[in-house]
Every structure is written in C-alpha cells, then in structure tokens.
Curated annotation (Swiss-Prot):
InterPro entries with a match to the protein in the record: Poxvirus_A9 (IPR006920)
One Pfam family named in its UniProt record: Pox_A9
Similarity annotation: Belongs to the chordopoxvirinae A9 family.
UniProt entry tagged with the keyword Transmembrane helix: yes
Intravirion side: 23-45
Name this protein carries in UniProt: Virion membrane protein OPG135
Membrane topology: Single-pass membrane protein
Signal peptide extent: 1-22
Function: Envelope protein. Required for an early step in virion morphogenesis.
Transmembrane segments: 46-66
Keyword entries, A-Z: Glycoprotein, Host cytoplasm, Late protein, Membrane, Signal, Transmembrane, Transmembrane helix, Virion
Origin species: Monkeypox virus
Length: 100
C-alpha cells in the first residue's frame, strides 16, 4: 500500500468518525430534550438514563466501525489472493509457451 493511500484512508476514517460523532451529539441533544421534559435534569435517574444512552450510542458506533474495517480487510485479502492467482497463471502460461 502506498503512503498516499494510507493517508487518504486515515483521513477518510477520521472524517467518518467526525460525522458519526456529530450524529451521536445530535441524538443526545434530542434525547436530553425529551428527558428534561419528563425527568428533572439533576435527578439520579436522569443521570443514569443519560449515561446508559451514551454508552449504547458509542457501542453502536464501535460495532459499526469494526464491521466496516473487517469488510475492508476481507476485500483486501480477496484482492491480494486474486492477484497472486493471476501472477501464478501468467507465470505458468509463460513457462508452458517457452517449452515449445
């Protein structure tokens, strides 16, 4: 993998992470708005519900990022094995044609 590809992938990953972080913040603000209407903002249950909601949102984000990275790794492994098979096929064709 070239240096440029690695840099582009890392910048792309960071950008996606920022988008996901913004989505989590937006969901948290909506959730807090509705919770503040039902619960007092400084009550124990409000804090517990807020902490659990944050943990669930970050858990979903983590699982999604792991899934995306595994799919990318599988795609790269398949591409590498296909290119190795192509190289073997070309070398066997070249060796067969040189014997004639």
């Amino acid at each position: 993998m070239s240096c440029y590809t690695a840099i582009l992938k890392s910048v792309g990953g960071l950008a996606l992470f920022q988008v996901a972080n913004g989505a989590i913040d937006l969901c948290r603000h909506f959730f807090m708005y509705f919770c503040e209407q039902k619960l007092r903002p400084n009550s124990f249950w409000f804090v517990v519900v807020r902490a659990i909601a944050s943990m669930i949102m970050y858990l979903v984000l983590g699982i999604a990022l792991l899934y995306i990275s595994e799919q990318d790794d599988k795609k790269n492994t398949n591409n590498d094995s296909n290119s190795n098979n192509d190289k073997r096929n070309v070398s066997s064709i070249n060796s067969n044609s040189s014997h004639k």
